[in-house]
Amino acid sequence: MVVYFSLGTNLGDKEQNLRMAVQKIRKQIGEVISLSAFYATAPWGFSSDNTFLNAALCVDTALAPLEVLQTTQEIEREMGRTHKSVNAVYSDRVIDIDLLLCFADDDTPVLLDTPELKLPHPLMQIGRAHV
């Protein structure tokens, strides 16, 4: 399965945070097929003096989508993220890893609508550049 992620950070050494997240994804989820350049964005959905550094990532994995989600949440905790955004209340964070899209081995899009995971990521539809 091929999965697409967006990564974002607006605390600490942002470039190092992204590099560490990519390294952990490579080790725990699968082979990195491609990685975008890092790019800066303003906070979305809340006010902060800290701009975000973001990246997009494509990974080949043998994990199922919910396993990928659980693993990314473990990585976020390992890196110091103490809470997830709830009810669209956002805050500064060391790392945010969003699972955007998944494609099965036959290139069929994986569609999910569960309480834990929605694929494709619902905020992709509103044009959020860094989801």
Spans of model-derived segments:
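N-terminal beta1-alpha1 ligand-phosphate binding loop
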Residues: 1-29, 36-42
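Small-molecule pocket liners
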Residues: 3, 55, 128
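A structural signal for short, well-ordered beta-strand segments
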Residues: 7, 35, 55-57, 97-99
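Structured loop/turn residues at secondary-structure junctions
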Residues: 9-10, 60-63
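A general structural signal for well-ordered alpha-helical packing
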Residues: 18, 22, 54, 69-72
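Short, charge-patterned binding micro-sites
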Residues: 36-60
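Flexible, gly/pro- and Lys/Arg-enriched active-site loops
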Residues: 44-51, 63-130
